[in-house]
């Protein structure tokens, strides 16, 4: 893991995260023009950082937030589509990989709300991962939720997963990506005040807990509704920050992520190898007791057992100490039911 140079090497993936200014757009043509601007940014960053392998833009950076429901439907993209064609061509032209936001992606059933989607494009201009946000930021966001994570071989073979904004507040999604082999988890977000300190802290904790690299791209600026705090960052698999932006609009950070180092750590680290130890619980004591050398593999957590085997019951259980309705009468949001 290295920070401070503009290069990369056969073993290191050069990663840049962009503090892209949150756009406020209303039409398809405006979205496409913004895509062309993102393409120009890619070219400029590659010129300044010749070692760049992967560039990451925030959630909402392509479309902005469509606060008008009709505009949200009118500007929703297809994958592949006009928007992705512009972004893919920029990746191919500059020989870099890119992560881009589509807010939204058209639902398969036209009348249902769009998805909040990320795509990973390789340096040949091919879409190699499409991820739909599993945990939209309720009660405000009205995206239709996705249903799974993905892991693919990224630049130089580094294994990459994508997650979006509020997803990252749930330890389960980080662990799912890591346990499926992800070495770099990319979190694209359009996070606003007042949650700045919590969001900076959680990505470091999740990198540490899951022994993975984390790259965060966050929006900046004010779109007339929310103020976005930036602080796009790149975190090492030991939980230390390699590089972090401030609140500056269109700032960026860059670091080199070693493929060999993370694989070495996951194989040889012992006391802090959380991924291995979770599935080999108490192996020292089990071995000393003559019960084998693999520890305990079974899940000890009652909540997870219930959730997998009876999700409706798990939902009812949490409602007993939270609330039974999605809406809250004391602070209603839209037309969400409060009873």
UniProtKB/Swiss-Prot annotation:
Broad EC category: hydrolase
EC number assigned by the record: 3.5.1.4
Protein keywords: Hydrolase
Entry keyword annotation includes Hydrolase: yes
The organism's place on the tree of life at top rank: Bacteria
UniProt key word Hydrolase: yes
Catalysed reaction, written as an equation: a monocarboxylic acid amide + H2O = a monocarboxylate + NH4(+)
Molecular-function GO term, any one: amidase activity
Pfam families for the chain: CN_hydrolase (PF00795)
Domain CN hydrolase: 13-259
Active site: 59, 133, 165
Function field: Catalyzes the hydrolysis of short-chain aliphatic amides to their corresponding organic acids with release of ammonia. Also exhibits in vitro acyl transferase activity, transferring the acyl moiety of short-chain amides to hydroxylamine to form hydroxamates.
Family: Belongs to the carbon-nitrogen hydrolase superfamily. Aliphatic amidase family.
Protein name: Aliphatic amidase
Species: Helicobacter pylori (strain Shi470)
Organism lineage string: Bacteria, Pseudomonadati, Campylobacterota, Epsilonproteobacteria, Campylobacterales
Name of the encoding gene: amiE
């Amino acid at each position: 893991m290295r920070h401070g140079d503009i290069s990369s090497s056969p073993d290191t993936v050069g990663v840049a995260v962009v503090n892209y200014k949150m756009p406020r757009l209303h039409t398809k043509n405006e979205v496409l023009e913004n895509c062309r601007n993102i393409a120009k940014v890619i070219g400029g960053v590659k010129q300044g950082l010749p070692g760049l392998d992967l560039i990451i833009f925030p959630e909402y950076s392509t479309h902005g937030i469509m606060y008008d429901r009709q505009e949200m439907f009118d500007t929703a993209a297809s994958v592949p589509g006009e928007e992705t064609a512009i972004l893919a061509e920029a990746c191919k032209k500059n020989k870099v990989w890119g992560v881009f936001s589509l807010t939204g992606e058209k639902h398969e059933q036209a009348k249902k709300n769009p998805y909040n989607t990320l795509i990973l494009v390789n340096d040949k201009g091919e879409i190699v991962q499409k991820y739909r946000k599993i945990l939209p930021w309720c009660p405000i966001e009205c995206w239709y939720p996705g249903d799974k994570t993905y892991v693919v071989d990224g630049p130089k073979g580094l294994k990459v997963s994508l997650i979006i904004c509020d997803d990252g507040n749930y330890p389960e999604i980080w662990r799912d990506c890591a346990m499926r082999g992800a070495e770099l988890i990319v979190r694209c977000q359009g996070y606003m005040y007042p949650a700045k300190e919590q969001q900076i802290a959680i990505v470091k904790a999740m990198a540490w807990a899951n022994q993975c690299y984390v790259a965060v791209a966050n929006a900046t600026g004010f779109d007339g509704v929310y103020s976005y705090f930036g602080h796009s960052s790149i975190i090492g698999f030991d939980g230390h920050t390699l590089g972090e932006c401030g609140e500056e609009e269109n700032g960026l950070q860059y670091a080199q992520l070693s493929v060999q180092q993370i694989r070495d750590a996951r194989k040889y680290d012992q006391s802090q190898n959380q991924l291995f130890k979770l599935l080999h619980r108490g192996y020292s004591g089990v071995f000393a007791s003559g019960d084998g050398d693999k520890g305990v593999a079974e899940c000890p957590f009652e909540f997870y057992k219930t959730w997998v085997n009876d999700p409706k019951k798990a939902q009812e259980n949490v409602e007993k100490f939270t609330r039974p309705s999605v809406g809250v009468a004391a602070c209603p949001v839209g037309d969400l039911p409060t009873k």
